[in-house]
């Protein structure tokens, strides 16, 4: 079958990386696992051998022959023919996620996952995206994505995966990442506003926090002059001279709360 470029289909073929992903997920016969993207079923079959139940969300119905083969062999596999971004995940009751994700939905599907109550997720991403997810302050990888994902999950970069592991071969390297869901290490008063602050700051990651906020005041929906007044009011409570890319997530959370209190 010819894979769909529109759907970003690159099927994982290398069994070594399939095995590595499953091993890091530590699947047991008590686990209910969610997979996004069936492919030719290489990952699905291995999950089905270990898990209590495997839900697979797949959009491309041309893959039904692979699905039929798998469901005839494994009674614990259920295929959901739909767009993963539109499926209500709350009723599935999964506790783990293992998937070779379509790269064009990496960001939205990851944040959709993070809204759910799961234990661990072992996911395949484009290499550069994976590095940014795991980015730490004062590194080139540290980004809005780093702070947003690490707000309620620990991110572990497991390994780099070469194009030769897939069919067809993608133009970029990939990586396996493990997310371990947890409670936030710091509190924010309004998560939506916090995300707006992140967007405003990281549009200018090399600037000082004060300059970045003023230049992107529209992102937090505060008029520029009004924001300047707010920053002057709270400058005794925060160091606005620090560069965005050097500022730890918990300090950004504190900044978000200070700003939110002034709205």
UniProtKB/Swiss-Prot annotation:
Assigned EC number: 2.1.1.-
Protein task: Specifically dimethylates two adjacent adenosines in the loop of a conserved hairpin near the 3'-end of 16S rRNA in the 30S particle. May play a critical role in biogenesis of 30S subunits.
A GO CC term attached to the entry: cytoplasm
Name of the protein in its database record: Probable ribosomal RNA small subunit methyltransferase A
Record-linked PROSITE patterns: RRNA_A_DIMETH (PS01131), SAM_RNA_A_N6_MT (PS51689)
Matching InterPro entries: KsgA/Erm, rRNA_Ade_diMease-like_C, rRNA_Ade_Mease_Trfase_CS, rRNA_Ade_methylase_Trfase_N, rRNA_adenine_dimethylase, SAM-dependent_MTases_sf
Keyword Hydrolase: no
Keyword vocabulary terms for this entry: Cytoplasm, Methyltransferase, RNA-binding, rRNA processing, S-adenosyl-L-methionine, Transferase
Pfam family name, one: RrnaAD
Major place of residence: cytoplasm
Keyword check for Phosphoprotein: no
Similarity-based family: Belongs to the class I-like SAM-binding methyltransferase superfamily. rRNA adenine N(6)-methyltransferase family. RsmA subfamily.
One example GO MF annotation: rRNA (adenine-N6,N6-)-dimethyltransferase activity
Coiled coil: none
EC class of the enzyme, as a word: transferase
Residues that hold S-adenosyl-L-methionine according to the record: 12, 37, 58, 83, 100
Compartment list: Cytoplasm
